[in-house]
């Protein structure tokens, strides 16, 4: 039986694994995808303490996973489908097995929202991407359209522009929602232009995406942009959704986010939550790490005192 079962290998889950395994708790992480979670999709973490300019989110995630493993934390590459509380025993079920432990930390993070426009599902990975770090190199000499106006959209537009792509930010409002310094950098970049008050309505193409149907909500004009001689890429950044569907009916949720106390524990005794799935005001890598630390230390204290 595990002392702590951590669902999710992003910054919250990995920090918890580091603290728990270093405290000699029998710790396991369930992470079917890349270590680091959404952090791994970020090219630069300029506001993360100690991060160097050359540090990518992926590199930091890999180092955190290696650090957790060095203290003895195990990783199971399976998707968790349910969590059950049977008194003092917690049961985590994956697509292929069932695992028991004393405590659970849910740190499943969030996933990019989809716009839901015609052609979006068809052309994912065929011209449409949600990860500039992953796919930007394919379009370094291309024409790229970034959909969105928040921090993620503007940060990734800057990354793509610095690769050499000609970037057009398509934003439905007349100003960015991104932080001011990011907006100013984007507006000053020679490779970036902006279509204000413009919405993506459809993605066109056959085998690959080769056109966009756009709508200007100020002029009521609908128009089409077609691929030229250069590669065409579409990067969509319109928010994220907490990955908590498997917790419905188990934990108290608010719009999909988990309510926790000062020790990161949910309304169910022994089940904790940390990171982007927590009901809170700010979602940053740094506070995800802090929440993972708090949860792990709370579990370690309970094990010492009561188990």
Language-model features, listed with the residues they occupy:
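Glycine/small-residue-rich loop that forms an oxyanion/phosphate-binding "nest" at active or ligand-binding sites
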Residues: 75-138
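Conserved phosphate-binding and hydrolysis motifs of nucleotide-dependent enzymes
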Residues: 8-13, 109, 148-150, 275
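FAD-site-proximal beta/loop scaffold in flavoenzymes
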Residues: 116, 122-140, 236-287, 291, ...
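Beta1-alpha1 glycine-rich phosphate/pyrophosphate-binding loop at the start
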Residues: 2-71, 154-179
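A Rossmann-like FAD-binding core segment of flavoenzymes
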Residues: 68-93, 98-100, 162-262, 301-307
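Phosphate-coordination loops involved in phosphoryl transfer and adenosine-cofactor binding
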Residues: 1-3, 77, 140-142, 197, ...
């Amino acid at each position: 039986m595990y002392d702590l079962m951590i669902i999710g290998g992003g910054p919250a889950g990995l920090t918890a694994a580091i603290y728990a395994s270093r405290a000699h708790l029998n710790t396991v992480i369930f992470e079917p995808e890349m270590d680091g979670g959404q952090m791994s999709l970020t090219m630069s973490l300029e506001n993360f303490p100690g991060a160097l300019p050359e540090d990518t989110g992926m590199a930091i995630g890999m180092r955190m996973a290696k650090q957790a493993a060095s203290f003895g934390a195990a990783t199971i590459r399976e998707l968790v489908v349910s969590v059950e509380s049977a008194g003092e025993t917690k049961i985590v079920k994956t697509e292929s097995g069932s695992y028991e432990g004393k405590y659970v930390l849910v740190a499943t993070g969030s996933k990019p929202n989809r716009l839901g426009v015609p052609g979006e599902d068809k052309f994912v990975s065929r011209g449409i991407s949600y990860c500039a770090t992953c796919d930007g190199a394919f379009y370094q000499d291309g024409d790229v359209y970034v959909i969105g106006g928040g921090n993620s959209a503007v940060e990734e537009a800057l990354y793509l522009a610095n690769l050499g792509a000609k970037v057009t930010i398509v934003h439905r409002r007349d100003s960015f929602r991104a932080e001011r310094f990011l907006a100013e950098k984007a507006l000053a970049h020679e490779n970036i232009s902006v279509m204000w008050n413009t919405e993506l309505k459809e993605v066109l193409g056959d085998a690959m995406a080769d056109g966009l149907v756009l709508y200007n909500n100020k002029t009521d004009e609908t128009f089409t942009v077609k691929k030229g001689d250069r590669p065409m890429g579409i990067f969509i950044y319109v928010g994220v959704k907490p990955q908590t569907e498997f917790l419905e009916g188990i934990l108290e949720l608010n719009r999909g986010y988990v309510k926790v106390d000062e020790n990161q524990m949910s309304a169910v005794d022994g089940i904790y939550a940390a990171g982007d799935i927590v009901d809170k005001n700010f979602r940053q890598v740094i506070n995800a790490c802090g929440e993972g630390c708090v949860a792990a230390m709370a579990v370690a204290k309970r094990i010492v005192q009561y188990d």
